[in-house]
Design a protein with these regions (language model features):
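A preference for well-ordered globular domain cores
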Residues: 1-105
Length: 105
């Protein structure tokens, strides 16, 4: 577990007794949750289903599908960086950069 201890004198100590594999798994899970949350905030499940069924006009369906694909690709980019990390700090430093939301969603 990674712990941060802040002292009254302003000194900060970081304790990290996780293995690299544990740190990688923890970060991948966090980014997976962030990706899902980002998609669901932008395109709720009902919107995703309607787009998959083609209920909306084709341009909107395509924009929704492309946004979800962009989020998935960003997650996969991050996952690759995390799995290539050689230290816990390197794995923890990988951040998800949400793709821009297309107009018309």
């Amino acid at each position: 577990m990674k712990s941060i201890l802040a002292h009254i004198d302003g000194k900060i100590e970081v304790f990290d007794d996780r293995t690299l594999i544990e740190a990688q798994a923890e970060r991948i899970e966090l980014l997976r949750e962030m990706t899902t949350q980002n998609i669901n905030q932008t395109c709720p499940q009902s919107t995703q289903q309607n787009a998959a069924l083609g209920i909306y006009e084709p341009a909107r369906c395509e924009a929704i599908k492309n946004y979800i694909a962009a989020c998935r690709n960003e997650y996969l980019r991050c996952k690759g960086l995390i799995l290539a990390a050689t230290s816990n700090d390197e794995a923890d430093s990988v951040t998800f950069i949400a793709p821009p939301v297309p107009e018309g969603l």
